[in-house]
Amino acid sequence: MSITFQLCRIPIRTDLALAEPLSVTGTVTGTLRCRKPFVIRCSGESSSTAADSDFDAKVFRKNLVRSKNYNRKGFGHKEETLQLMDSEYTSDIIKTLKDNGNEYRWGNVTVKLAEAYGFCWGVERAVQIAYEARKQFPEEKIWITNEIIHNPTVNKRLEEMKVENIPIDEGRKQFEIVNKGDVVILPAFGAGVDEMLALSDRNVQIVDTTCPWVSKVWNTVEKHKKGEYTSIIHGKYAHEETIATASFAGTYIIVKNMKEAMYVCDYILGGQLDGSSSTREEFMEKFKNAVSKGFDPDKHLVKAGIANQTTMLKGETEEIGKLVERTMMQKYGVENINEHFQSFNTICDATQERQDAMYKMVEERIDLMLVVGGWNSSNTSHLQEIAEERGIPSYWIDSEQRIGPGNKIAYKLNHGELVEKENWLPEGPITVGVTSGASTPDKVVEDVLIKVFDLKSEEALQVA
């Protein structure tokens, strides 16, 4: 799903602010008050809520979690919903592979499965809680603020369960369509502060499936904010997770890759790193969609902390952190580094495990690689990137429907280019490496492999 993001306004009560004291039962006894109206942030620009010095996002989130209209743990239907998910998303083929050391032969196709692949616990948890919400509220209107995960199969299943996306008109989410008593699911990527405020104001039941690893990153940028450090966020500025993370930050800049990080660090050093940066005006034009409101590179790059979108390449995040640390040492001296740099480990374990398994897989003797996952999945794109860098023929597809008759395939490269190829499966016996993104059910991988087996069976019949 492609969404054009822009700064957008939504009419919301403006008397929200820092919390009153809590009762001994843990429920909110006061109201939240805020002096200034705010706008919902739908782009790289910061929201006025986040920029409001009177507003404490951490306090707001803490009190939201304690409110009676908020749930992030499910509704007591875990066993039942996991059984349903098991029937819909598991795979006999994947089970056979796991039972045989992640390698098995079907006809003239040998399949090698990565050691870590597919659904991570955070994704499984998010989907399970969403299923529980439908069970708990069978008649209520249920909305979701974004795709729950980046997988078309799972998102379609939720649509079939009458979980509806909040409509978007010209880049603006139509929150006014949500009525008191409706249920609203926050996806695994989380939701921005302004969206949470809007929903809280409308007195709806919030079901929060945000991955705890994402929440961990929010805690990190809140620490940066408290210490008056600018958060340098390694991520994609239009990605749902990064939008949410930035809403909890104070001052921030989002860098997509090492090249952009080098540009920022070169600017800090006055062009003495690699000469890639230029004027302040050029800097602001380059990052106009990826910085907080009022960002000034001459003022806000004196103290910096590192955070990341949890699905980015682990190694690149680490290298960016080291680069910024070295830059601050060069600029301000080793003895003063703690006054100018903070680093926290916000790399998701599941992302790291899948990337490590992929690095191991590409060292195996395989003829080609199948990377299965949603085409808008950031973590899946990086698995494809690892294979491409190794020079292995690799095909990133989101479902078996991308494999057509006559040995044709439509797939994406890691940077998003769509490619169509004929005769992609070599003749004769082949060894296929397989992995899948953290949002991909095993059943989707099974359907892909069945298509491959069918094509190779047709080939064998033609030879015979």
From Swiss-Prot:
Transit peptide endpoints, chain numbering: 1-66
Q: Does the keyword Glycosyltransferase apply?
A: no
Highest taxon in the source lineage: Eukaryota
Q: What's noted on cofactor binding?
A: Binds 1 [4Fe-4S] cluster per subunit.
Q: Does the keyword Metal-binding apply?
A: yes
Name the InterPro entries for this protein.
LytB/IspH (IPR003451)
- The cysteines covalently paired via disulfide bonds are none
Annotated [4Fe-4S] cluster binding sites: C120, C211, C348
> Which controlled-vocabulary keywords does the entry list?
4Fe-4S, Chloroplast, Iron, Iron-sulfur, Metal-binding, Oxidoreductase, Plastid, Transit peptide
Tell me the residue numbers annotated for binding (2E)-4-hydroxy-3-methylbut-2-enyl diphosphate.
Answer: H150, H239, T310, S377, S378, N379, S439
Localization terms from the record: Plastid, Chloroplast stroma
What are this entry's molecular-function GO terms? Answer: 4 iron, 4 sulfur cluster binding; 4-hydroxy-3-methylbut-2-enyl diphosphate reductase activity; metal ion binding
Which GO biological process annotations does it have? dimethylallyl diphosphate biosynthetic process; isopentenyl diphosphate biosynthetic process, methylerythritol 4-phosphate pathway
Q: What is catalyzed by this enzyme?
A: isopentenyl diphosphate + 2 oxidized [2Fe-2S]-[ferredoxin] + H2O = (2E)-4-hydroxy-3-methylbut-2-enyl diphosphate + 2 reduced [2Fe-2S]-[ferredoxin] + 2 H(+); dimethylallyl diphosphate + 2 oxidized [2Fe-2S]-[ferredoxin] + H2O = (2E)-4-hydroxy-3-methylbut-2-enyl diphosphate + 2 reduced [2Fe-2S]-[ferredoxin] + 2 H(+)
Chief site of localization: plastid
Enzyme Commission designation:
1.17.7.4
Q: Which tissue types show expression of this protein?
A: Mainly expressed in leaves and trichomes, and, to a lower extent, in roots, flowers and stems.
**Active-site residue numbers:** E241
Per the record, GO CC terms? chloroplast stroma
Query: Which cofactors does the annotated protein need, by name?
Result: [4Fe-4S] cluster
The entry describes its oligomerization and partners as: Homodimer.
Q: Which family does it belong to?
A: Belongs to the IspH family.
Instruction: Briefly state the protein's biological role.
Output: Enzyme of the plastid non-mevalonate pathway for isoprenoid biosynthesis that converts 1-hydroxy-2-methyl-2-(E)-butenyl 4-diphosphate into isopentenyl diphosphate (IPP) and dimethylallyl diphosphate (DMAPP). Is essential for chloroplast development.
Q: What is this protein called?
A: 4-hydroxy-3-methylbut-2-enyl diphosphate reductase, chloroplastic
Gene name linked to the record: HDR
